[in-house]
Protein backbone atom coordinates (compact mmCIF):
# COMPACT_ATOMS: atom_id res chain seq x y z
CA UNK A 1 0.00 0.00 0.00
CA UNK A 2 3.02 2.31 0.43
CA UNK A 3 3.60 2.07 -3.30
CA UNK A 4 -0.01 3.10 -3.80
CA UNK A 5 0.33 6.19 -1.56
CA UNK A 6 3.45 7.15 -3.47
CA UNK A 7 1.72 6.62 -6.82
CA UNK A 8 -1.26 8.69 -5.68
CA UNK A 9 0.99 11.57 -4.61
CA UNK A 10 2.79 11.38 -7.95
CA UNK A 11 -0.52 11.28 -9.79
CA UNK A 12 -1.64 14.46 -8.02
CA UNK A 13 1.49 16.23 -9.24
CA UNK A 14 1.61 14.62 -12.67
CA UNK A 15 -2.03 15.35 -13.47
CA UNK A 16 -1.34 19.08 -13.24
CA UNK A 17 1.25 18.94 -16.00
CA UNK A 18 0.82 16.62 -18.93
CA UNK A 19 3.67 14.23 -18.39
CA UNK A 20 1.86 11.26 -19.90
CA UNK A 21 4.53 8.68 -19.07
CA UNK A 22 4.58 9.39 -15.34
CA UNK A 23 0.75 9.47 -15.30
CA UNK A 24 0.65 6.08 -17.09
CA UNK A 25 2.96 4.43 -14.55
CA UNK A 26 0.89 5.86 -11.65
CA UNK A 27 -2.29 4.53 -13.26
CA UNK A 28 -0.70 1.09 -13.68
CA UNK A 29 0.14 1.12 -9.98
CA UNK A 30 -3.46 2.05 -9.10
CA UNK A 31 -4.86 -0.74 -11.27
CA UNK A 32 -2.50 -3.26 -9.70
CA UNK A 33 -3.54 -2.16 -6.20
CA UNK A 34 -7.22 -2.44 -7.14
CA UNK A 35 -6.68 -5.97 -8.47
CA UNK A 36 -4.90 -7.00 -5.24
CA UNK A 37 -7.37 -5.45 -2.79
CA UNK A 38 -10.12 -3.47 -4.41
CA UNK A 39 -11.88 -2.24 -1.26
CA UNK A 40 -8.75 -1.03 0.54
CA UNK A 41 -7.30 0.61 -2.57
CA UNK A 42 -10.61 2.34 -3.35
CA UNK A 43 -10.80 3.81 0.18
CA UNK A 44 -7.24 5.10 -0.16
CA UNK A 45 -7.92 6.66 -3.59
CA UNK A 46 -10.94 8.44 -2.17
CA UNK A 47 -9.15 9.63 0.98
CA UNK A 48 -6.26 11.07 -1.02
CA UNK A 49 -8.69 13.20 -3.02
CA UNK A 50 -7.92 11.63 -6.41
CA UNK A 51 -11.51 11.37 -7.72
CA UNK A 52 -11.85 15.09 -8.61
CA UNK A 53 -8.67 14.80 -10.74
CA UNK A 54 -10.08 12.03 -12.92
CA UNK A 55 -12.50 14.07 -15.11
CA UNK A 56 -9.56 15.98 -16.62
CA UNK A 57 -7.77 12.68 -17.28
CA UNK A 58 -10.77 11.36 -19.23
CA UNK A 59 -9.57 13.09 -22.33
CA UNK A 60 -10.67 11.53 -25.65
CA UNK A 61 -7.24 12.29 -27.16
CA UNK A 62 -5.17 10.82 -24.32
CA UNK A 63 -3.69 7.35 -24.39
CA UNK A 64 -4.32 7.13 -20.62
CA UNK A 65 -8.09 7.31 -21.03
CA UNK A 66 -8.88 3.55 -21.20
CA UNK A 67 -6.86 3.01 -17.99
CA UNK A 68 -8.62 5.86 -16.18
CA UNK A 69 -12.01 4.46 -17.23
CA UNK A 70 -10.90 0.98 -16.12
CA UNK A 71 -9.87 2.35 -12.68
CA UNK A 72 -13.28 4.00 -12.32
CA UNK A 73 -15.01 0.76 -13.36
CA UNK A 74 -13.01 -1.21 -10.77
CA UNK A 75 -13.66 1.27 -7.95
CA UNK A 76 -17.37 1.45 -8.74
CA UNK A 77 -17.68 -2.28 -8.09
CA UNK A 78 -17.87 -1.12 -4.44
CA UNK A 79 -21.24 0.29 -3.54
CA UNK A 80 -19.69 2.92 -1.22
CA UNK A 81 -17.69 4.38 -4.14
CA UNK A 82 -20.63 5.03 -6.47
CA UNK A 83 -21.92 8.27 -4.93
CA UNK A 84 -18.40 9.77 -4.63
CA UNK A 85 -17.85 8.98 -8.35
CA UNK A 86 -21.05 10.85 -9.21
CA UNK A 87 -20.15 13.76 -6.91
CA UNK A 88 -16.71 14.01 -8.53
CA UNK A 89 -18.49 14.72 -11.83
CA UNK A 90 -17.37 11.56 -13.63
CA UNK A 91 -20.63 10.82 -15.48
CA UNK A 92 -20.62 13.66 -18.11
CA UNK A 93 -17.03 13.04 -19.34
CA UNK A 94 -17.68 9.27 -19.43
CA UNK A 95 -20.81 9.81 -21.54
CA UNK A 96 -18.76 11.98 -23.93
CA UNK A 97 -16.34 9.08 -24.36
CA UNK A 98 -19.12 6.88 -25.75
CA UNK A 99 -18.61 8.82 -29.00
CA UNK A 100 -15.04 7.53 -29.25
CA UNK A 101 -14.00 5.17 -32.04
CA UNK A 102 -11.44 3.39 -29.85
CA UNK A 103 -12.93 0.03 -28.87
CA UNK A 104 -10.94 -0.27 -25.63
CA UNK A 105 -12.06 3.21 -24.53
CA UNK A 106 -15.66 2.27 -25.33
CA UNK A 107 -15.47 -0.98 -23.42
CA UNK A 108 -13.96 0.51 -20.24
CA UNK A 109 -16.27 3.53 -20.39
CA UNK A 110 -19.31 1.27 -20.68
CA UNK A 111 -18.10 -0.77 -17.69
CA UNK A 112 -17.48 2.37 -15.64
CA UNK A 113 -20.92 3.83 -16.34
CA UNK A 114 -22.58 0.46 -15.77
CA UNK A 115 -20.89 -0.04 -12.39
CA UNK A 116 -21.53 3.53 -11.16
CA UNK A 117 -25.22 3.32 -12.06
CA UNK A 118 -25.67 -0.31 -11.02
CA UNK A 119 -28.98 -0.80 -9.21
CA UNK A 120 -29.74 2.93 -9.12
CA UNK A 121 -32.89 3.84 -11.04
CA UNK A 122 -32.29 7.55 -10.52
CA UNK A 123 -28.78 7.41 -12.03
CA UNK A 124 -29.96 5.19 -14.88
CA UNK A 125 -32.74 7.71 -15.56
CA UNK A 126 -30.06 10.43 -15.64
CA UNK A 127 -28.15 8.44 -18.28
CA UNK A 128 -31.34 8.10 -20.33
CA UNK A 129 -31.95 11.85 -20.14
CA UNK A 130 -28.37 12.45 -21.28
CA UNK A 131 -29.10 10.42 -24.41
CA UNK A 132 -27.04 7.26 -23.91
CA UNK A 133 -29.63 4.96 -25.49
CA UNK A 134 -29.29 6.11 -29.15
CA UNK A 135 -25.49 6.22 -28.67
CA UNK A 136 -25.34 2.64 -27.37
CA UNK A 137 -27.68 1.34 -30.09
CA UNK A 138 -25.39 2.91 -32.69
CA UNK A 139 -22.35 1.30 -31.02
CA UNK A 140 -24.02 -2.10 -31.16
CA UNK A 141 -24.53 -1.68 -34.90
CA UNK A 142 -20.97 -0.52 -35.59
CA UNK A 143 -19.14 -2.96 -33.30
CA UNK A 144 -21.34 -6.06 -33.52
CA UNK A 145 -18.23 -8.16 -34.33
CA UNK A 146 -16.58 -7.19 -31.01
CA UNK A 147 -17.88 -9.72 -28.47
CA UNK A 148 -16.86 -7.80 -25.34
CA UNK A 149 -18.40 -4.54 -26.59
CA UNK A 150 -21.55 -6.31 -27.69
CA UNK A 151 -21.94 -7.86 -24.25
CA UNK A 152 -21.36 -4.48 -22.60
CA UNK A 153 -24.16 -2.96 -24.73
CA UNK A 154 -26.52 -5.85 -23.95
CA UNK A 155 -25.94 -5.57 -20.20
CA UNK A 156 -26.58 -1.82 -20.41
CA UNK A 157 -29.76 -2.36 -22.45
CA UNK A 158 -30.95 -4.99 -19.98
CA UNK A 159 -30.58 -2.55 -17.07
CA UNK A 160 -32.02 0.49 -18.86
CA UNK A 161 -34.95 -1.39 -20.44
CA UNK A 162 -36.37 -2.03 -16.97
CA UNK A 163 -37.13 1.70 -16.72
CA UNK A 164 -40.41 2.82 -18.28
CA UNK A 165 -38.81 6.11 -19.39
CA UNK A 166 -36.39 4.20 -21.63
CA UNK A 167 -39.04 2.58 -23.83
CA UNK A 168 -39.85 5.71 -25.80
CA UNK A 169 -36.16 6.34 -26.53
CA UNK A 170 -35.58 2.72 -27.53
CA UNK A 171 -38.61 2.90 -29.83
CA UNK A 172 -37.05 5.83 -31.70
CA UNK A 173 -33.89 3.82 -32.54
CA UNK A 174 -33.39 0.74 -34.70
CA UNK A 175 -32.80 -1.46 -31.64
CA UNK A 176 -35.27 -4.07 -32.92
CA UNK A 177 -33.31 -4.64 -36.15
CA UNK A 178 -29.95 -4.65 -34.34
CA UNK A 179 -31.06 -7.20 -31.73
CA UNK A 180 -32.69 -9.47 -34.29
CA UNK A 181 -29.59 -9.30 -36.51
CA UNK A 182 -27.40 -10.11 -33.52
CA UNK A 183 -29.70 -12.96 -32.47
CA UNK A 184 -29.53 -14.54 -35.92
CA UNK A 185 -25.72 -14.68 -35.68
CA UNK A 186 -25.61 -16.41 -32.29
CA UNK A 187 -25.18 -20.11 -31.82
CA UNK A 188 -24.27 -20.17 -28.11
CA UNK A 189 -27.01 -20.60 -25.53
CA UNK A 190 -25.55 -17.95 -23.15
CA UNK A 191 -25.44 -15.29 -25.87
CA UNK A 192 -29.02 -15.99 -26.91
CA UNK A 193 -30.09 -15.78 -23.26
CA UNK A 194 -28.42 -12.36 -22.95
CA UNK A 195 -30.35 -11.08 -25.95
CA UNK A 196 -33.59 -12.62 -24.64
CA UNK A 197 -33.09 -10.73 -21.37
CA UNK A 198 -33.11 -7.45 -23.28
CA UNK A 199 -35.95 -8.44 -25.62
CA UNK A 200 -38.41 -9.38 -22.85
CA UNK A 201 -38.63 -5.95 -21.13
CA UNK A 202 -38.50 -4.11 -24.48
CA UNK A 203 -41.32 -6.23 -25.92
CA UNK A 204 -43.64 -4.94 -23.20
CA UNK A 205 -43.89 -1.74 -25.26
CA UNK A 206 -46.48 -1.94 -28.06
CA UNK A 207 -44.49 0.19 -30.53
CA UNK A 208 -41.39 -1.97 -30.01
CA UNK A 209 -43.50 -5.16 -30.28
CA UNK A 210 -44.46 -4.17 -33.80
CA UNK A 211 -40.86 -3.20 -34.66
CA UNK A 212 -39.64 -6.60 -33.45
CA UNK A 213 -42.28 -8.40 -35.52
CA UNK A 214 -41.31 -6.36 -38.59
CA UNK A 215 -37.61 -7.03 -37.96
CA UNK A 216 -38.25 -10.80 -38.14
CA UNK A 217 -37.99 -11.79 -34.48
CA UNK A 218 -40.92 -14.20 -34.77
CA UNK A 219 -39.12 -16.28 -37.39
CA UNK A 220 -36.10 -16.48 -35.05
CA UNK A 221 -38.32 -17.57 -32.17
CA UNK A 222 -40.03 -20.25 -34.25
CA UNK A 223 -36.60 -21.53 -35.24
CA UNK A 224 -35.55 -21.75 -31.57
CA UNK A 225 -38.77 -23.63 -30.78
CA UNK A 226 -38.10 -26.05 -33.64
CA UNK A 227 -34.53 -26.68 -32.44
CA UNK A 228 -35.36 -27.16 -28.75
CA UNK A 229 -38.80 -28.79 -28.66
CA UNK A 230 -37.45 -32.33 -28.34
CA UNK A 231 -34.35 -31.34 -26.36
CA UNK A 232 -33.68 -32.98 -23.00
CA UNK A 233 -30.95 -30.59 -21.86
CA UNK A 234 -31.78 -27.94 -19.29
CA UNK A 235 -30.71 -25.15 -21.63
CA UNK A 236 -33.04 -26.45 -24.37
CA UNK A 237 -35.97 -26.46 -21.97
CA UNK A 238 -35.08 -22.94 -20.79
CA UNK A 239 -34.74 -21.61 -24.35
CA UNK A 240 -38.02 -23.19 -25.44
CA UNK A 241 -39.80 -21.52 -22.53
CA UNK A 242 -38.21 -18.12 -23.15
CA UNK A 243 -38.88 -18.21 -26.90
CA UNK A 244 -42.51 -19.31 -26.59
CA UNK A 245 -43.20 -16.84 -23.74
CA UNK A 246 -41.75 -14.01 -25.82
CA UNK A 247 -43.89 -15.08 -28.74
CA UNK A 248 -47.03 -14.76 -26.58
CA UNK A 249 -45.82 -11.37 -25.32
CA UNK A 250 -45.56 -10.09 -28.92
CA UNK A 251 -49.20 -11.06 -29.44
CA UNK A 252 -50.35 -8.82 -26.59
CA UNK A 253 -50.01 -5.77 -28.85
CA UNK A 254 -53.06 -5.19 -31.07
CA UNK A 255 -51.07 -4.19 -34.17
CA UNK A 256 -48.41 -6.87 -33.81
CA UNK A 257 -51.13 -9.48 -33.16
CA UNK A 258 -53.12 -8.53 -36.28
CA UNK A 259 -49.96 -8.48 -38.39
CA UNK A 260 -49.20 -12.07 -37.36
CA UNK A 261 -52.80 -13.24 -37.70
CA UNK A 262 -52.95 -12.08 -41.35
CA UNK A 263 -56.66 -12.86 -41.58
CA UNK A 264 -56.03 -16.37 -40.25
CA UNK A 265 -53.80 -17.17 -43.24
CA UNK A 266 -50.52 -16.19 -41.54
CA UNK A 267 -47.81 -18.84 -41.41
CA UNK A 268 -47.05 -17.80 -37.82
CA UNK A 269 -50.67 -18.32 -36.82
CA UNK A 270 -50.62 -21.77 -38.46
CA UNK A 271 -47.40 -22.72 -36.65
CA UNK A 272 -48.81 -21.65 -33.30
CA UNK A 273 -51.90 -23.79 -33.96
CA UNK A 274 -49.66 -26.80 -34.40
CA UNK A 275 -48.35 -26.30 -30.83
CA UNK A 276 -51.71 -27.14 -29.25
CA UNK A 277 -51.67 -30.90 -30.05
CA UNK A 278 -47.94 -31.04 -29.13
CA UNK A 279 -46.78 -33.36 -26.33
CA UNK A 280 -44.76 -30.56 -24.76
CA UNK A 281 -46.61 -28.76 -21.94
CA UNK A 282 -44.73 -25.51 -22.51
CA UNK A 283 -45.78 -25.44 -26.17
CA UNK A 284 -49.37 -26.41 -25.36
CA UNK A 285 -49.45 -23.52 -22.90
CA UNK A 286 -47.96 -21.02 -25.35
CA UNK A 287 -50.28 -22.23 -28.11
CA UNK A 288 -53.40 -21.80 -25.96
CA UNK A 289 -52.26 -18.37 -24.71
CA UNK A 290 -51.54 -17.32 -28.28
CA UNK A 291 -55.07 -18.32 -29.35
CA UNK A 292 -56.47 -16.37 -26.37
CA UNK A 293 -54.53 -13.33 -27.63
CA UNK A 294 -55.55 -13.77 -31.28
CA UNK A 295 -59.12 -13.98 -29.96
CA UNK A 296 -59.12 -10.38 -28.80
CA UNK A 297 -61.34 -9.16 -31.62
CA UNK A 298 -64.60 -10.52 -32.99
CA UNK A 299 -63.41 -11.00 -36.57
CA UNK A 300 -60.52 -13.22 -35.50
CA UNK A 301 -62.78 -15.17 -33.10
CA UNK A 302 -65.36 -15.89 -35.79
CA UNK A 303 -62.68 -17.01 -38.26
CA UNK A 304 -61.02 -19.28 -35.69
CA UNK A 305 -64.26 -20.97 -34.64
CA UNK A 306 -65.16 -21.52 -38.31
CA UNK A 307 -61.79 -23.16 -38.96
CA UNK A 308 -62.14 -25.74 -36.18
CA UNK A 309 -59.93 -24.39 -33.42
CA UNK A 310 -62.47 -25.25 -30.72
CA UNK A 311 -62.00 -28.98 -31.30
CA UNK A 312 -58.22 -28.66 -30.82
CA UNK A 313 -58.71 -26.79 -27.53
CA UNK A 314 -61.26 -29.32 -26.28
CA UNK A 315 -58.91 -32.20 -27.06
CA UNK A 316 -56.16 -30.36 -25.19
CA UNK A 317 -58.41 -29.83 -22.16
CA UNK A 318 -59.47 -33.47 -22.23
CA UNK A 319 -55.82 -34.48 -21.93
CA UNK A 320 -55.53 -32.34 -18.78
CA UNK A 321 -58.62 -33.40 -16.82
CA UNK A 322 -56.82 -36.04 -14.78
CA UNK A 323 -53.59 -34.91 -13.13
CA UNK A 324 -53.84 -31.84 -15.30
CA UNK A 325 -51.38 -29.04 -15.74
CA UNK A 326 -53.10 -26.03 -14.14
CA UNK A 327 -51.43 -23.41 -16.35
CA UNK A 328 -52.50 -25.27 -19.50
CA UNK A 329 -56.07 -25.65 -18.18
CA UNK A 330 -56.19 -21.94 -17.37
CA UNK A 331 -54.83 -20.92 -20.79
CA UNK A 332 -57.15 -23.20 -22.78
CA UNK A 333 -60.19 -21.98 -20.82
CA UNK A 334 -59.07 -18.35 -21.42
CA UNK A 335 -58.97 -19.05 -25.14
CA UNK A 336 -62.46 -20.63 -25.11
CA UNK A 337 -63.87 -17.75 -23.07
CA UNK A 338 -62.57 -15.18 -25.57
CA UNK A 339 -63.77 -17.22 -28.55
CA UNK A 340 -67.27 -17.35 -27.02
CA UNK A 341 -67.70 -13.56 -26.95
CA UNK A 342 -69.16 -13.02 -30.48
CA UNK A 343 -72.85 -13.98 -30.52
CA UNK A 344 -72.52 -16.05 -33.71
CA UNK A 345 -69.93 -18.30 -32.04
CA UNK A 346 -71.98 -19.27 -29.00
CA UNK A 347 -74.34 -21.82 -30.55
CA UNK A 348 -71.51 -23.32 -32.65
CA UNK A 349 -69.37 -23.78 -29.56
CA UNK A 350 -72.26 -25.23 -27.57
CA UNK A 351 -72.94 -27.71 -30.39
CA UNK A 352 -69.25 -28.66 -30.35
CA UNK A 353 -69.69 -29.71 -26.70
CA UNK A 354 -67.70 -26.93 -25.04
CA UNK A 355 -69.97 -26.76 -21.98
CA UNK A 356 -69.63 -30.50 -21.32
CA UNK A 357 -65.84 -30.41 -21.44
CA UNK A 358 -65.67 -27.27 -19.28
CA UNK A 359 -67.91 -28.91 -16.65
CA UNK A 360 -65.31 -31.66 -16.21
CA UNK A 361 -63.23 -29.05 -14.33
CA UNK A 362 -65.94 -28.29 -11.76
CA UNK A 363 -63.97 -30.30 -9.20
CA UNK A 364 -60.85 -28.14 -9.62
CA UNK A 365 -59.57 -26.61 -6.40
CA UNK A 366 -57.47 -24.03 -8.26
CA UNK A 367 -58.99 -20.51 -8.15
CA UNK A 368 -57.46 -19.40 -11.52
CA UNK A 369 -59.07 -22.43 -13.23
CA UNK A 370 -62.36 -21.90 -11.37
CA UNK A 371 -62.38 -18.24 -12.45
CA UNK A 372 -61.87 -19.01 -16.15
CA UNK A 373 -64.33 -21.93 -16.08
CA UNK A 374 -67.05 -19.62 -14.72
CA UNK A 375 -66.24 -16.89 -17.24
CA UNK A 376 -66.37 -19.36 -20.13
CA UNK A 377 -69.78 -20.72 -19.12
CA UNK A 378 -71.12 -17.20 -18.58
CA UNK A 379 -70.01 -16.13 -22.07
CA UNK A 380 -71.47 -19.28 -23.64
CA UNK A 381 -74.99 -18.91 -22.21
CA UNK A 382 -75.32 -15.19 -22.89
CA UNK A 383 -78.54 -14.96 -25.03
CA UNK A 384 -78.64 -18.79 -25.29
CA UNK A 385 -81.88 -19.77 -23.50
CA UNK A 386 -81.65 -23.50 -24.15
CA UNK A 387 -78.09 -23.80 -22.85
CA UNK A 388 -78.91 -21.62 -19.82
CA UNK A 389 -81.86 -23.90 -19.10
CA UNK A 390 -79.76 -27.03 -19.41
CA UNK A 391 -76.94 -25.73 -17.18
CA UNK A 392 -79.31 -24.02 -14.75
CA UNK A 393 -81.08 -27.29 -13.97
CA UNK A 394 -77.75 -29.06 -13.39
CA UNK A 395 -77.89 -29.50 -9.60
CA UNK A 396 -74.16 -30.27 -9.29
CA UNK A 397 -73.21 -27.05 -11.09
CA UNK A 398 -75.59 -24.89 -9.06
CA UNK A 399 -74.37 -26.49 -5.82
CA UNK A 400 -70.75 -25.70 -6.73
CA UNK A 401 -71.67 -22.12 -7.69
CA UNK A 402 -73.34 -21.56 -4.34
CA UNK A 403 -70.22 -22.94 -2.63
CA UNK A 404 -67.97 -20.58 -4.63
CA UNK A 405 -70.27 -17.63 -3.87
CA UNK A 406 -68.80 -17.93 -0.37
CA UNK A 407 -65.14 -17.98 -1.49
CA UNK A 408 -64.24 -14.85 0.49
CA UNK A 409 -60.51 -15.37 -0.17
CA UNK A 410 -60.99 -15.24 -3.93
CA UNK A 411 -63.00 -12.17 -4.89
CA UNK A 412 -62.74 -13.00 -8.60
CA UNK A 413 -64.20 -16.50 -8.19
CA UNK A 414 -66.87 -15.19 -5.84
CA UNK A 415 -67.91 -12.44 -8.27
CA UNK A 416 -67.98 -14.76 -11.30
CA UNK A 417 -70.04 -17.40 -9.43
CA UNK A 418 -72.65 -14.81 -8.53
CA UNK A 419 -72.72 -13.50 -12.09
CA UNK A 420 -73.13 -17.00 -13.56
CA UNK A 421 -75.90 -17.82 -11.08
CA UNK A 422 -77.73 -14.66 -12.14
CA UNK A 423 -77.04 -15.31 -15.85
CA UNK A 424 -78.54 -18.82 -15.70
CA UNK A 425 -81.82 -17.29 -14.51
CA UNK A 426 -81.76 -14.20 -16.74
CA UNK A 427 -81.05 -16.08 -19.98
CA UNK A 428 -83.27 -19.12 -19.34
CA UNK A 429 -86.23 -17.27 -17.75
CA UNK A 430 -87.16 -20.79 -16.66
CA UNK A 431 -89.17 -21.82 -13.61
CA UNK A 432 -87.15 -25.06 -13.41
CA UNK A 433 -83.87 -23.11 -13.22
CA UNK A 434 -85.34 -20.82 -10.55
CA UNK A 435 -86.42 -23.89 -8.59
CA UNK A 436 -82.91 -25.41 -8.82
CA UNK A 437 -81.31 -22.15 -7.62
CA UNK A 438 -83.77 -21.83 -4.70
CA UNK A 439 -83.21 -25.46 -3.67
CA UNK A 440 -79.44 -25.03 -3.96
CA UNK A 441 -79.49 -22.05 -1.58
CA UNK A 442 -78.54 -19.46 -4.19
CA UNK A 443 -81.14 -16.78 -3.42
CA UNK A 444 -79.33 -15.18 -0.47
CA UNK A 445 -76.20 -14.75 -2.61
CA UNK A 446 -78.14 -12.92 -5.30
CA UNK A 447 -79.56 -10.59 -2.64
CA UNK A 448 -76.01 -9.90 -1.40
CA UNK A 449 -74.91 -9.36 -5.01
CA UNK A 450 -77.53 -6.61 -5.30
CA UNK A 451 -75.44 -4.63 -2.78
CA UNK A 452 -72.20 -5.03 -4.79
CA UNK A 453 -70.05 -1.96 -5.44
CA UNK A 454 -70.19 -2.75 -9.17
CA UNK A 455 -73.33 -1.40 -10.79
CA UNK A 456 -73.34 -4.04 -13.53
CA UNK A 457 -73.42 -6.80 -10.88
CA UNK A 458 -76.13 -5.03 -8.86
CA UNK A 459 -78.27 -4.81 -11.95
CA UNK A 460 -77.74 -8.44 -12.98
CA UNK A 461 -78.74 -9.50 -9.45
CA UNK A 462 -81.91 -7.37 -9.41
CA UNK A 463 -83.07 -8.68 -12.80
CA UNK A 464 -82.51 -12.30 -11.65
CA UNK A 465 -84.33 -11.65 -8.36
CA UNK A 466 -87.20 -10.07 -10.31
CA UNK A 467 -87.50 -13.25 -12.39
CA UNK A 468 -87.41 -15.44 -9.26
CA UNK A 469 -90.22 -13.36 -7.75
CA UNK A 470 -92.24 -13.49 -10.97
CA UNK A 471 -91.75 -17.23 -11.62
CA UNK A 472 -91.89 -18.76 -8.13
CA UNK A 473 -92.51 -16.26 -5.34
CA UNK A 474 -94.02 -18.87 -3.03
CA UNK A 475 -90.89 -21.05 -3.08
CA UNK A 476 -88.53 -18.05 -2.72
CA UNK A 477 -90.49 -16.23 -0.01
CA UNK A 478 -88.63 -17.75 2.97
CA UNK A 479 -85.20 -16.99 1.43
CA UNK A 480 -86.23 -13.43 0.53
CA UNK A 481 -87.28 -12.81 4.13
CA UNK A 482 -84.13 -14.47 5.52
CA UNK A 483 -81.85 -12.39 3.28
CA UNK A 484 -83.63 -9.12 4.20
CA UNK A 485 -84.42 -8.41 0.55
CA UNK A 486 -86.96 -5.68 1.34
CA UNK A 487 -84.55 -3.62 3.46
CA UNK A 488 -81.85 -4.02 0.76
CA UNK A 489 -84.29 -2.60 -1.80
CA UNK A 490 -85.19 0.24 0.56
CA UNK A 491 -81.49 1.15 0.85
CA UNK A 492 -81.00 1.04 -2.93
CA UNK A 493 -83.99 3.30 -3.54
CA UNK A 494 -83.03 5.76 -0.78
CA UNK A 495 -79.39 6.02 -1.89
CA UNK A 496 -78.94 9.01 -4.17
CA UNK A 497 -75.86 7.39 -5.72
CA UNK A 498 -77.84 4.42 -7.10
CA UNK A 499 -77.90 4.47 -10.91
CA UNK A 500 -81.27 4.93 -12.69
CA UNK A 501 -81.42 1.28 -13.81
CA UNK A 502 -80.82 0.13 -10.21
CA UNK A 503 -83.71 2.30 -9.00
CA UNK A 504 -85.94 1.08 -11.86
CA UNK A 505 -85.26 -2.63 -11.26
CA UNK A 506 -85.62 -2.22 -7.47
CA UNK A 507 -89.14 -0.80 -7.97
CA UNK A 508 -90.06 -3.62 -10.37
CA UNK A 509 -88.94 -6.06 -7.68
CA UNK A 510 -90.92 -4.29 -4.94
CA UNK A 511 -94.07 -4.67 -7.06
CA UNK A 512 -93.25 -8.34 -7.70
CA UNK A 513 -92.86 -9.26 -4.01
CA UNK A 514 -96.12 -7.56 -2.94
CA UNK A 515 -97.94 -10.82 -3.66
CA UNK A 516 -96.30 -12.38 -0.59
CA UNK A 517 -97.90 -11.59 2.74
CA UNK A 518 -94.75 -11.48 4.93
CA UNK A 519 -92.86 -9.44 2.31
CA UNK A 520 -95.83 -7.12 1.83
CA UNK A 521 -95.85 -6.46 5.60
CA UNK A 522 -92.16 -5.57 5.49
CA UNK A 523 -92.77 -3.17 2.60
CA UNK A 524 -95.49 -1.42 4.61
CA UNK A 525 -93.39 -1.19 7.76
CA UNK A 526 -90.51 0.51 5.91
CA UNK A 527 -92.56 3.42 4.53
CA UNK A 528 -91.60 2.76 0.91
CA UNK A 529 -94.25 5.14 -0.30
CA UNK A 530 -92.20 8.18 0.85
CA UNK A 531 -89.07 7.07 -1.02
CA UNK A 532 -91.00 6.11 -4.16
CA UNK A 533 -93.06 9.31 -4.35
CA UNK A 534 -89.82 11.35 -4.33
CA UNK A 535 -88.64 9.37 -7.36
CA UNK A 536 -91.61 10.59 -9.40
CA UNK A 537 -89.60 13.79 -9.91
CA UNK A 538 -86.49 11.85 -11.08
CA UNK A 539 -84.80 13.29 -14.18
CA UNK A 540 -84.81 9.88 -15.86
CA UNK A 541 -88.22 9.38 -17.52
CA UNK A 542 -88.21 5.58 -17.16
CA UNK A 543 -87.52 5.90 -13.43
CA UNK A 544 -90.16 8.60 -12.84
CA UNK A 545 -92.77 6.60 -14.80
CA UNK A 546 -92.02 3.42 -12.84
CA UNK A 547 -92.19 5.44 -9.59
CA UNK A 548 -95.75 6.52 -10.47
CA UNK A 549 -96.78 2.91 -11.20
CA UNK A 550 -95.12 1.63 -8.02
CA UNK A 551 -96.76 4.36 -5.93
CA UNK A 552 -100.19 3.39 -7.30
CA UNK A 553 -99.49 -0.26 -6.48
CA UNK A 554 -98.34 0.56 -2.95
CA UNK A 555 -101.36 2.82 -2.33
CA UNK A 556 -103.82 0.28 -3.70
CA UNK A 557 -102.41 -2.48 -1.49
CA UNK A 558 -101.82 -0.54 1.69
Q: Where are the predicted features?
A:
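Leucine-rich repeat
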Residues: 38-39, 79, 121, 164, ...
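N-terminal "cap/leader" segments of large eukaryotic alpha-helical scaffolds
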Residues: 1-56, 73
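Recurring C-terminal helix/loop segment of individual leucine-rich repeat
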Residues: 43, 83, 122-125, 168, ...
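Long amphipathic alpha-helical scaffold regions
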Residues: 54-55, 63, 75-76, 80-81, ...
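Alpha-helical solenoid repeats of the armadillo/HEAT superfamily
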Residues: 17-31, 60-76, 87, 100-118, ...
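Alpha-helical scaffold repeats of the Armadillo/HEAT/TPR superfamily
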Residues: 2-6, 45-53, 86-94, 128-136, ...
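Short, solvent-exposed loop/edge segments of extracellular or virion-exposed proteins
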Residues: 11-15, 225-229, 317
Amino acid sequence: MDNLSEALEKLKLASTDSATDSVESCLDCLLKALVNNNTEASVKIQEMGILPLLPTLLNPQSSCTPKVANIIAEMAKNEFMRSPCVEAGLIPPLIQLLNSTDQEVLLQTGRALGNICYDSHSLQAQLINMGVIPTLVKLLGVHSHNTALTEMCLIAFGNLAELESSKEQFASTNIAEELVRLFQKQSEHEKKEMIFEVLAPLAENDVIKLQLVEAGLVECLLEVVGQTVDGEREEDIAQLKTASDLMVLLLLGDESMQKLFEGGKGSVFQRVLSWIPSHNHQLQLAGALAIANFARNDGNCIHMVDTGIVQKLLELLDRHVEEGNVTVQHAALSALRNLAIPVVNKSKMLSAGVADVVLKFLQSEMPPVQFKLLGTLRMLIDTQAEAADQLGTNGKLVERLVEWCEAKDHAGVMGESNRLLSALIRHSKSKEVVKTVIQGGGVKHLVTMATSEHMIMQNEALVALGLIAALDLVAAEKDFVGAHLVSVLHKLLSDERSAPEIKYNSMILICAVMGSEPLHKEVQSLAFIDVVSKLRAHENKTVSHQASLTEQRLTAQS
